[in-house]
Curated annotation (Swiss-Prot):
TM spans (from-to): none
Function description: Binds and compact DNA (95 to 150 base pairs) to form nucleosome-like structures that contain positive DNA supercoils. Increases the resistance of DNA to thermal denaturation.
Name of the protein: Archaeal histone B
Oligomer status and interactors: Homodimer or heterodimer with another histone. Dimers then assemble into higher oligomers, with the DNA wrapped around the protein core.
UniProt cross-references to InterPro entries, sorted A to Z: Archaeal_histone_HMF, CBFA_NFYB_domain, Histone-fold, HmfB-like, TAF_TATA-bd_Histone-like_dom
Domain of life: Archaea
Region (Interaction with DNA): 20-22, 54-57
Amino acid sequence: MAELPIAPVDRLIRKAGAQRVSEKAAKLLAEHLEEKALEIARKAVDLAKHAGRKTVKVEDIKLAIRS
């Protein structure tokens, strides 16, 4: 189950042009977004560790997104 709140995901879908959004659709997108965010975060943590740091910096996130 996704930890991301459903309301912001609902707003994103509406911003994309939907007039109505089912709860199941918003939950499914929230789960997918959370999985993608965790994937990026894990890569960023690995990059920070590789650089000898404990702190994840914006550069780590940018590089993780590009890879």
